[in-house]
Amino acid sequence: MMFPAIRSGRRRSLVDRRHELTATRAGCGCCAPPMLGGGSGKNPLQTASTEGSSELRLTDFQPRSMLHVPITRVEKPAFPVIDVHTHLSWMSETRSGVSLGEAMTYFADPAELLPLMDRKGIRTMVNLTGGTGRGLEETIARFDAVAPGRFRTMTEPSFQLFAESDYPRLQAEAIEHAHRIGAAGLKLLKTLGLYLREGIDQGELVGVDDARFAPMWETCAALKMPVFIHTSDPEAFFLPGNNQNERYEELARHPDWSFYGPEYPSHRDLLAARDRVIARHPETTFVLMHVGNQAEDLATIANCMERHPNVHVDISARISELGRQPRMARRFFERYQDRILFGTDAVPAPYGNDVPQQLLGDELYEIYYRFLETEDEYFDYAPAAVPPQGRWSIYGVGLPHEILRKLYHDNAARLLGMDP
């Protein structure tokens, strides 16, 4: 078996999150070395004086590797790139995590983006969060019409209509309208299963596999519109935010990203619901964002792809996971080379400043190219002083040109109906 089953470990016990966040802000001393030597409290192996020493806050600890290894700068990719996962706009109204309405906020315009795209060899940016209705029309006019072929825009669900009794029909009609005006596909944020409720922001959570969404999936299949879906989040976001959570610092910076507790479905249950949708709609093409939020468990996402030929994945915001398991990741790329898409989850400044692993810029793309094209060792996966998703570094997978061409360009061009 290419990807042998991996057993998950026992879940850790709950530690009071509020205490931990307070400790983080105050400067927690729980990581101090053990004190030996009886009543004096002095470590007998410590010979240097401790007078004048001071504690170092974890957030200020920014070590630099002493490894002397090759450093390869890849300024342009081996082949033109279609970045299938960028956010150049966002719905202006958000209620409890649910994007609503037709008003849009724009993060950049073509005049700002095209020079970067030319420098970094990017043929096309796909703006996943293009909105609905009049907002979608405005987004397409702002990007796709101004620079044809350089931008493609996707539509989103019209969740403001969810409370209507005939929502399934209205949603299908909204997607048909989006297709007529040029939307390249449908994008779903992690709204389903985690944010959308029966009363939009009140009542029970609405499951990913709720039958009311069936016409939405079926309409996309009929129109050959790929569905780019984000379900769940990294597994660590569903575990206690304690001293054993490897993404503790990230969750401390973004406590709203934690979904640990009985009020939320488990990581496993969310992905099982997603897989049921995929199985029920074999004619619909699903692109699972962020390696399906299973980049930490490539054996499981590989099993999903084996069972469902209508599944593709993108690698956006997950080279941090792929790059710390380079041998297994390379086998994954080799096995599914026709079904993996290049994406970054890029967000322009200043909106992306808080998520450096997504901050649109030259350095972000060069890191991705270095990961994919070289066998460099132990380098940063994001342009940040402290690794934002976890304190580790990554290794390049050094893919051959025949795979790079598909990953960078051809797979996305085929799904989006673009010229080769």
Describe the role of every protein-language-model region.
Residues I82-T86, M125-N127, R152-T155, L186-L188, ...:
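Hydrophobic faces of well-ordered beta-strands that scaffold small-molecule active sites
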Residues R57-S65, F107, P262, H267-R276, ...:
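H/E-rich (His + Asp/Glu) clusters that bind or coordinate divalent metals
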Residues L45-V146, R169, N411:
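An N-terminally biased module of ancient metal coordination in phosphate/nucleic-acid-related enzymes
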Residues H85, M117, A178, L186, ...:
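Conserved, mostly hydrophobic/aromatic
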Residues E20-L21, P34:
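Short glycine-rich, low-complexity segments
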Residues R57-L58, P63-S65, L136-S258, P309:
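Active-site gating/metal-coordination segments in enzymes
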Residues W90-E93, E102-A108, N127-E138, Q160-L170, ...:
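Acidic-and-aromatic substrate-binding clefts and catalytic sites of carbohydrate-active enzymes
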Residues C28-C31:
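Cysteine-centered motifs
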